[in-house]
Amino acid sequence: MSAPATDLSAGAPSGRRQILVTSALPYANGQIHIGHLVEYIQTDIWVRTLRMHGHEVYYVGADDTHGTPVMLRAEKEGLTPKQLIDRVWQEHKRDFDSFGISFDNYYSTDSEENRVLSENVYLALKEAGLIDARDIEQAYDPVKEMFLPDRFIKGECPKCGAKDQYGDSCEVCGSTYLPTELINPYSVVSGATPVRKTSTHYFFRLSDPRCENFLRAWVGGLAQPEATNKMREWLGDAGEAKLADWDISRDAPYFGFEIPGAPGKYFYVWLDAPVGYYASFKNLAEKRGLDFDAWVRKGSKAEQYHFIGKDILYFHTLFWPAMLEFSGHRTPTNVFAHGFLTVDGAKMSKSRGTFITAQSVIETGLNPEWLRYYFAAKLNSTMEDLDLNLDDFQARVNSDLVGKYVNIASRAAGFLIKRFDGRVQDSAMQHPLLASLRAAVPQIAANYEAREYNRALRQTMELADAVNAYVDTAKPWDQAKDPANGVALHETCSVSIEAFRLLSLALKPVLPKLAEAVEGFLAIQPLVWADANVPLSSTRPINAYKHLMTRVDPKQIEALLAANRDSLQATPEAAAPADAKGKSKAAKAAAGKDETPGIISIDDFAKIDLRIAKIVDCKAVEGSDKLLQLTLDVGEEKTRNVFSGIKSAYQPEQLVGKLTVMVANLAPRKMKFGLSEGMVLAASATDEKAEPGLYVLEPDSGAKPGMRVK
């Protein structure tokens, strides 16, 4: 079982904890974009919070380097895979450094440590009787003489007919399907028509009762209810045997680690990638003289946390803990999943190119800490998606960071330097306003540790409002006009600067570079949480004030959009059928009678992808009288967000847990409240005034999320 869960009580936890933290490993096949940065910023804030408590915390990461895409991209660029991943590593490290991501070690999964650890995990699982060899049939490129992953096969979508769609899903209509269903399939690598070929593969027996029983017990320790519910759904009820065995091998040619005793067979990237967490830490342990085994062996008292996107929850809450448990390692203390990022309501997609790169943020002159603050202001402990609204981004940064926070120092520092030699009034350090700020710091720290960053920052900005109200009431600019007000002016400026120090302490996990500049300005040691009760002193004068932060200029936003314009174009919607163009609507039927739609063919009907969906969450939409926001499980790795105009008929709690039917391939629609990714079906009378009522369709209880309605 996992180590004890984190103590999230207010204030610093008792005792010095040993904590290993990771973020998911970025793939060495492309640039870091701001969707990636949500996770790294979230993790970094948490790590900095724990370090400020004085705990022994190590934050490690690595590039995920293995797999067919890396091999093929290197070939396309005329490089060896090693040359490609070395170059991409430098680019990734540059971007992480620019955004203040404070890795203790940033490594590569293509390392000797990772090869040895991956082999050891595999051999331990084999010794435990959890590895099977089986023959499977796969798509094969007869020209390149290689087996093809689903994403390396393209063809015409079997649902809407769109050309050049991937072997597992259509990016025009949103349908999912098997590669064998593609029309006129071809290999992305050579253009040849794939053939079917049999090969021996190696499987991790996740369906073994030992794995199932372990995972049923382990799932109870997860911090996020959404993750627990999803895992229980994947596990099913006792006796259902819903877990499938996991193919952990790939055939040559492949860039990765060869499986011991299996020439020409390689570990699938999802086996050695998470082991890469340990490999990076082992590399750090060797450099720092740490006892690696004491941290990762079964029964270790150290804590281990993984921050991930909700799309890889399956790997991190099923395969990874089971791999660790049955290879003699400790299991994760917890796994924290976050939602996806949209930009002005549009989903980010690397495969579609709809993303803003981290480097473009730097090159267009935006302060990386602006983005750190904005993301933190939207992040909480759930798996909710978050939206980067660029107008809101500009307004929030300018209002909160410049107008409220930095403004406090700029209003007081000049007077303190000119009139009082930069020294605070010691008696002012006991002011009631400062007492209220100090009392709030432990709760702010606790909110950070609980990953409720939005709550921590909301509380911090409320305190900044109180400080600004104090300054507005005291009017130091008026006090300075009369020498008789010298004591009062000194108090006002001293209270303001100490309040600024406390606000800087509260913001330090989010704005580390700004906090460092503040520490230099105030001539103090690096701030930690315990410093809430260590005020400024007249014995230590502050330094001259220098401008700490500028406002976001609209021209910078324009430059950012221009730099990413090609990747921000909307994905085209499926074209209307030719025979539907130019037709007028049929005349309405007489009042009280149903309108009979035109006859359609079975081919027309087949274009609609109807799926069983489970409503896993439902809430009212603030500002709308008609809409409910539904979170739907459609049997995919991630949930879908749908807005439905059924608020008049249902309370949100009535719908949670119900099965329904949705149109899964409806083009996503940007709405005022967010992105709607489908449509839930409901019935109503033709004349709703005469016969009111909305009725969400419910399938028979035997239906499962993701099943197609045919």
Swiss-Prot record:
Motif ('HIGH' region): 26-36
Binding locations of ATP: K350
Catalytic activity: tRNA(Met) + L-methionine + ATP = L-methionyl-tRNA(Met) + AMP + diphosphate
Gene Ontology terms: cellular component: cytosol
HAMAP family: Met_tRNA_synth_type1
Subunit structure: Homodimer.
Gene Ontology BP terms: methionyl-tRNA aminoacylation
UniProt-listed Enzyme Commission number(s): 6.1.1.10
Protein's UniProt keywords contain Cytoplasm: yes
Cofactors: Zn(2+)
Residue positions binding Zn(2+): C157, C160, C170, C173
Highest taxon of source: Bacteria
Domain tRNA-binding: 604-710
Motif 'KMSKS' region, chain ranges: 347-351
UniProt enzyme class: ligase
Keywords associated with the record: Aminoacyl-tRNA synthetase, ATP-binding, Cytoplasm, Ligase, Metal-binding, Nucleotide-binding, Protein biosynthesis, RNA-binding, tRNA-binding, Zinc
Protein name: Methionine--tRNA ligase
Cited function: Is required not only for elongation of protein synthesis but also for the initiation of all mRNA translation through initiator tRNA(fMet) aminoacylation.
Comment on bound cofactor: Binds 1 zinc ion per subunit.
Protein's gene: metG
A single MF term (Gene Ontology): ATP binding
